[in-house]
């Protein structure tokens, strides 16, 4: 999915958010955001920690979890719960998209479908509601898992 913001712009917003919350600036927070931005995919806390440890051996998994909680609360990242691979994170500054999640291997596929978006808006209109947000996840067995199960 196309990015809606540059990494530098996100980091600048992060610095303002840290200041607004009365926290000290932390290179680790910026590094977590950078790892997620550059990955372009959904990462687990362990994968994020491993990536950061390539530069900073002192990074702990507990610090990464605390940072992820803060980033989620401040809407810098989105969390995706999968039964197979646990919580996975992605940068929030992307075009709207939905997810297909394989229940067998945990693979995550991002997609955008204008017809589905249109239909969701029609449903909202039918009930005279105001759509604030939505998050669609379809749980499947991916092609590879279907083939390996045969």
From Swiss-Prot:
Give the matching InterPro entries: FUR, Fur_C, WH-like_DNA-bd_sf, WH_DNA-bd_sf
Example of a GO biological process term: negative regulation of DNA-templated transcription
GO MF term list: DNA-binding transcription factor activity; transcription cis-regulatory region binding; zinc ion binding
Q: Binding positions for Zn(2+)?
A: 42, 90, 99, 102, 105, 110
| One cellular-component annotation, GO | cytosol
Cell compartment(s), UniProt: Cytoplasm
Q: Which UniProt keywords apply?
A: Cytoplasm, DNA-binding, Iron, Metal-binding, Repressor, Transcription, Transcription regulation, Zinc
Instruction: Give a yes or no for keyword Membrane in this entry.
Output: no
Q: Provide the residue span(s) of the region labelled DNA-binding.
A: 1-93
Region Dimerization: list its residue ranges: 94-150
Q: Where are the transmembrane segments?
A: none
Cite the binding residues for Fe cation: 96, 98, 117, 134
Q: Key word Zinc present in the record?
A: yes
Q: Which superkingdom does the taxonomy of this entry point to?
A: Bacteria
- Pfam families associated with the record: FUR
Q: Provide the primary localization.
A: cytoplasm
Q: What does this protein do?
A: Acts as a global negative controlling element, employing Fe(2+) as a cofactor to bind the operator of the repressed genes.
Q: Share what the entry says about its subunit structure, partners included.
A: Homodimer.
Family per record: Belongs to the Fur family.
Protein name, UniProt field: Ferric uptake regulation protein
Organism, as annotated: Helicobacter pylori (strain J99 / ATCC 700824) (Campylobacter pylori J99)
Q: What is the lineage of its organism?
A: Bacteria, Pseudomonadati, Campylobacterota, Epsilonproteobacteria, Campylobacterales
